[in-house]
Regions:
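Active-site-proximal loop/helix segment associated with metal-binding centers of metalloenzymes
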Residues: 139-218, 224-226
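Binuclear metal-ion centers of metallo-dependent hydrolases, dominated by the metallo-beta-lactamase
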Residues: 130, 213-310
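Metal-dependent catalytic neighborhoods of phosphoester/phosphodiester hydrolases
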Residues: 81-89, 110-113, 272-281
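Conserved beta-strand hairpin/beta-sheet module of binuclear metal-dependent hydrolase folds
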Residues: 8-59, 65, 152-154, 195-206, ...
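Short, surface-exposed amphipathic charged segments that create phosphate/polyanion-binding patches used
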Residues: 134-142, 154, 302-310
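Active-site neighborhood of phospho(di)ester-bond hydrolases with catalytic His/Asp-centered motifs
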Residues: 46-49, 66-74, 103, 204-209, ...
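Active-site metal-binding motif and surrounding structural segment of the metallo-beta-lactamase
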Residues: 50-101, 124-131
Length: 310
């Protein structure tokens, strides 16, 4: 689903629509989880909790845009919105195939949820039980939670951006551009001399987990990392007991991975003012831009890196 090619054109819009930011207990201001990533022609819905269908109406996005649903684990606040979303898509007459990814151990729960959906939909189920690629450009890695859980990472391949002025100076135009892209060299002119390196963009979701290697792998060089921040640092004991991240641990995860933008979410209902969590994450986030997600936010993917940081 991720694309990489040589192009003179800017990227299509890539945007995250935040549908909910609560953890297990919603509040008046925060619905349960839900994150819709609009990525070129794809719509990837992560962890739809209760009320996701209604939140999409408030956000002004159609369920028909969803092409893929990714569930990190089968606790209710991460998946109980699946039947409503599928039913709405069927009601709207969606004809395209919809792919549903989830941990293999959650098969009974997922099938029960799917059975509650009404209407006809071309739905394909994709359980996974180990780290690896589950679709083109989409990989999973195991997290450390109380039940089997996986985070997701969407990676666009690195590529090259053609520079029109350099093409013109080299006398290359029309069909010759395609030949140069295909062969890598044309009449002694290498592709590298008329183009610039373009790092692929990376997006990652790390939900319910204690700090672990899987979370670090997902976060590595992410342009946008959506990470749970259930507890403040002062509740580190609770975080360890329930296998969650504190705000500071989410910040440290971003720093270790060289993340550009860290979006905190999945907040405990005990917190009304989230600025404290942001500051705790910021203190350990290195150079990452730290933001607090709020319901119905729209977060644009950061502009491309000019170079890859190691």
């Amino acid at each position: 689903m991720a694309r990489g090619s040589e192009s003179c054109e800017p990227q299509s819009m890539r945007e995250l629509v935040v549908l909910g930011t609560a953890s297990q207990v919603p509040t008046r201001e925060r619905n349960q989880n839900g994150y819709l990533l609009l990525w070129d022609g794809e719509g990837v819905l992560f962890d739809p909790g209760e009320g996701t269908q209604r939140q999409m109406i408030h956000a002004g996005v159609s369920a028909s845009r969803i092409t893929r649903i990714c569930v990190t684990h089968v606790h209710g606040d991460h998946c109980y919105g699946v039947p409503g979303v599928l039913s709405r898509m069927a009601l709207d007459g969606v004809e395209h195939t919809v792919h549903l990814h989830y941990p293999a151990s959650g098969e009974p729960v997922v099938r029960a949820l799917v059975s509650l959906a009404s209407g006809r939909l071309d739905l394909r189920l994709h359980p996974h039980g180990a780290a690896g690629e589950v679709a083109s450009g989409l990989e999973v890695r195991p997290l450390d939670h109380r039940i089997e859980a996986f985070g997701y990472r969407l990676s666009e391949p690195d590529g090259r951006t053609l520079v029109p002025e350099r093409l013109a100076a080299a006398g290359i135009g029309g069909p010759d551009v395609g030949r140069l892209q295909r062969d890598g060299v044309l009449r002694g002119v290498p592709l590298e001399s008329v183009s610039e390196f373009r790092p692929g963009q990376r997006f990652a979701v790390v939900m319910d987990t204690a700090p672990c290697a899987g979370a670090e792998g997902l976060a590595e060089r992410a342009d946008l990392l959506v990470a749970e921040s259930t507890f403040a640092d002062t509740e580190a004991g609770l975080a360890r007991e329930y296998r969650h991240l504190t705000a500071g641990e989410a910040g440290a995860l971003a720093a270790t991975g060289g993340v550009r933008t860290l979006l905190l979410t999945h907040f405990s209902s005990r917190y009304q003012d989230l600025e404290t969590l942001r500051l705790q994450a910021r203190a350990r986030a290195g150079g990452a831009d730290v933001r607090v997600a709020r319901d119905l936010d729209r977060i644009r993917m950061p502009g491309r890196r000019t170079r890859l940081r190691r």
